[in-house]
Regions:
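Rossmann-like NAD(P) dinucleotide-binding subdomain of oxidoreductase/dehydrogenase enzymes
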Residues: 117-258
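ALDH superfamily catalytic-core signature
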Residues: 22-35, 150, 228-365
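Glycine/threonine-rich beta-strand-loop-alpha-helix active-site module
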Residues: 178, 556-670
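Conserved C-terminal structural/oligomerization subdomain of aldehyde/semialdehyde dehydrogenase
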Residues: 20, 49, 53, 348-484
């Protein structure tokens, strides 16, 4: 059915003939009568909304299934009605669109939950409940009248939203016929009586009154830019679409016969009325002549210079590069008309079997009106000097008349396809497929099947996807109390007992070691002890010493140490001393491995260490951090904390992140046994303070309580 030719059945159904219309004089309803009509429809819809509240997912799915079958059963009749009433498009192609709306859309909706609890996650504690958005106003265009009615009715029924339609005046009767088919099937399947309604008054005032009615919850606007803008101006949620000016970039690596077939198939479908159809083919110069030969095989007519001017004049009221070309505006009479009719009206003739009229253009933009959206079987052809030029022309075309809509590319180079996608401000990038079918989804790709194509903020739309039932539900969320995970994190390796510093002799992967400490550690001979152990290794290790750490180390000292590290390039950093030396070494480690880190970023406060605004980078890629304490109390050797002073501001900044947790902690009591009594007592008070604070902390746990109580016990057992 997708490959049916445009000639088939035309004579029997009048697919390419302008329907004869006899003017019927009718009394124009007053504004008061129109308002009353709209009020009546909305009140009935609100009642239907109440009735829908008690429906189950199974009932809703049954209704949608029966409506889909009814649409399928009438797809040909509705297509015939649309062609005869509007005088536009092709019968069998409109039949295909009706089939698409019934079959592809319903298949996409089949497993979608839209009623009640749709998701319950015991892990996160989130329960999601789907509710209808309310009464929907559905705007229906003349380009796809019956298929749009079917599509919007199905997604409204799936979500338990009553819908009230405003049909385009030139497609009112065929749209109404489609609405009756779906409504009657829905009611027969158990839906509320007024689940689908429509305005019987054909006027802009009636449409505006409906869109602005306080009982309308949201608007599904498919139509011209003016109608979509009006929908968005109503002060309520609206799902509108923008104009499409779809370029098809034919890149030199493409499979040319397939690309040409796709473009002709897509552009000729329903006489080019789908907004996602190609408006221009931009062809690389390397394959330009081959492209021209190939496309002429498909009943495509290329206009000459004089015919191009006539075509521009008829379609846009201005010739290319003329004085008034900037004011060019599409003649609405050409939309959806066959190529032969367009040529005849423009003042020249083409063969009766012509599928598409092609015109070679020099550039994209106002000077070439045929590079605008045309919604007819007329295609601009442009030559690209290079890949960059082809992408630039495609991007310019989208920005010129179709921001946010769609763009197509035919290529075998996926990197070029990605580059094309980055460059074009189009929501849908269709690769190696007819853009008409690629844009509406589910035929050549996995896009959501839809006849309402959102264009995002590029096209001043509220949705940047193919509109579907997911856009017509409110999702309420129940958030169960779910306490944060608690955790205990220590260095991967903690060594203790007397002379445990011998681990430095046996550990693997040490070639360059930098010791960070203070001058007293040198004077007491502690540094020499560390160096002696390292020299006992089987391999030679280069050792660098930084002993300028002061009490309450400053950021300036840290930067001096970092500079030395960058020159020496250690693979092991050994912090020896009290809290000051270990804190300074941790921050040196951070800045050595990540020169881009800014102190102003890492010093910021936080509420949750796992959710802080600035994320510390992962450490250990260049060097391991080994902390060897020589006093008790701070515990810096096993914690993610470091306190650094900014002397210019005279402030201390506690830095905290699990990235600062040392790689290895060596707690060797040999270093604290020789402390003077007074200093040992001072550090004991430090231990006691930290232990009590840990025990009463709101972050205390069964793991930390044991350590805290044991620390308190040791203080009272061994200090007087």
């Amino acid at each position: 059915i997708w490959l049916c030719t445009n000639e088939k059945f035309h004579n029997s159904y009048g697919g390419n003939k302008m329907a004869e219309k006899k003017p019927v004089q009718q009394a124009v309803p007053t504004e008061a009568e129109t308002d009353a009509h709209v009020d009546d429809l909305v009140n009935k819809a609100l009642k239907a909304l109440e009735e829908f509240e008690d429906f189950t997912q199974e009932q809703v799915d049954y209704i949608v299934a029966k409506c889909s079958v009814a649409g399928l059963d009438h797809h040909g009749i509705l297509a015939e009605a649309a062609v005869k009433e509007t005088g536009r498009g092709v019968f069998e192609d409109k039949a295909v669109k009706n089939l698409f709306a019934c079959e592809y859309v319903t298949n996409n909706l089949r497993h979608l939950k839209t009623v009640g609890i749709i998701n319950e996650d015991p892990l996160t504690g989130i329960t999601e409940i789907a509710e209808p958005v309310g009464v929907v106003c559905g705007i229906v265009p003349t380009t796809n009248p019956t298929s749009t009615v079917i599509f919007k009715s199905l997604i409204a029924l799936k979500t338990r939203n009553p819908i009230i339609f405003s049909f385009h005046p030139s497609a009112h009767e065929s749209s109404k016929q489609a609405a009756i088919v779906i409504r009657d099937a829905a009611i027969a399947a158990g839906a509320p009586e007024n689940c689908i309604q429509w305005l019987s008054i054909k006027s802009m005032y009636a449409t505006n009154a409906l869109m602005n009615h306080p009982g309308i919850a949201t608007i599904l606007a498919t139509g011209g830019n003016a109608m979509v803008k009006a929908a968005y101006s109503c002060g309520k949620p609206a799902l509108g679409v923008g104009a499409g000016n779809v370029p098809a970039y034919v890149e030199k690596t493409c499979v040319l016969p397939r690309a040409v077939n796709d473009i002709v198939l897509s552009k000729s479908f329903d006489n080019g009325m789908i907004c996602a159809s190609e408006q221009a083919a931009i062809v690389d110069q390397e394959i330009y002549s081959d492209f021209m030969k190939e496309i002429k095989r498909f009943h495509v007519y290329f206009v000459n210079k004089e015919e191009k001017a006539k075509l521009e004049k008829f379609m846009f009221g201005a010739e290319a590069y003329s004085e008034n070309v900037a004011q060019a505006k599409l003649n609405p009479n050409v939309v959806g008309k066959p190529a032969e009719w367009i040529a005849e009206q423009a003042g020249f003739k083409v063969p009766a079997e012509t599928q598409i009229i092609c015109a070679e253009c020099k550039e994209v933009g106002p000077n070439e009106p045929l590079t605008r959206e045309k919604l007819s079987p007329v295609l601009a052809i442009l030559k690209a000097k290079s890949t960059d030029d082809g992408i630039a022309k495609a991007a310019a075309m989208v920005e010129f008349n179709g921001l946010g809509h769609s763009a197509a590319i035919h290529t075998e180079d996926h990197e070029i396809s990605k580059k094309f996608g980055h460059a074009c401000k189009a929501i849908r990038i269709i690769e190696n497929a007819p853009s008409t079918f690629g844009g509406i989804g589910s035929v050549y790709n996995a896009f959501i099947p839809s006849l309402t194509l959102g264009c995002g903020s590029y096209g001043h739309n509220s949705v940047s996807n193919n509109v579907s039932a997911v856009n017509l539900i409110n999702i309420k969320r129940i958030g169960r109390r779910n306490n944060n995970m608690q955790w205990v994190k220590l260095p991967p390796k903690v060594y203790f007992e007397k002379n445990s510093i011998r681990y430095l002799r046996d550990m693997k992967h040490m070639e360059k070691a930098m010791i960070v400490t203070d001058r007293s550690m040198v004077n007491l001979g502690y540094v020499e002890k560390i160096e002696d152990v390292i020299r006992r290794r089987r391999n030679h290790v280069d050792i660098e010493l930084f002993f300028d750490v002061e009490p309450d180390p400053s950021i300036d000292t840290v930067r001096e140490g970092v500079e030395l590290m960058r020159k020496f390039e250690p693979d092991c950093i050994i912090a020896l001393g009290g809290g000051s030396s270990m804190d300074a070494a941790k921050v040196m480690w951070l800045m050595y491995e990540n020169p881009e880190v800014n102190f102003d970023d890492i010093k910021q406060k936080f509420m949750d260490i796992r959710k802080r605004a600035f994320k510390f980078p992962e450490l250990g890629k260049k060097a391991k951090m080994i902390c060897i304490p020589t006093t008790s109390g701070t515990g810096s050797e096993v914690t993610p904390f470091a306190v650094i002073t900014d002397k210019k501001e005279n402030k201390k900044y506690p830095l905290t992140d699990y990235a600062l947790t040392p790689t290895i902690a060596i707690v060797d009591p040999e270093f604290v046994m020789s402390l003077p009594g007074a200093i040992a007592a001072d550090t004991g008070i430090d231990v006691l303070t930290h232990a009590v604070e840990a025990y009463v902390s709101i972050l205390a746990s069964d793991f930390t309580d044991g350590w805290a109580k044991q620390a308190v016990k040791l203080v009272f057992d061994y200090l007087e």
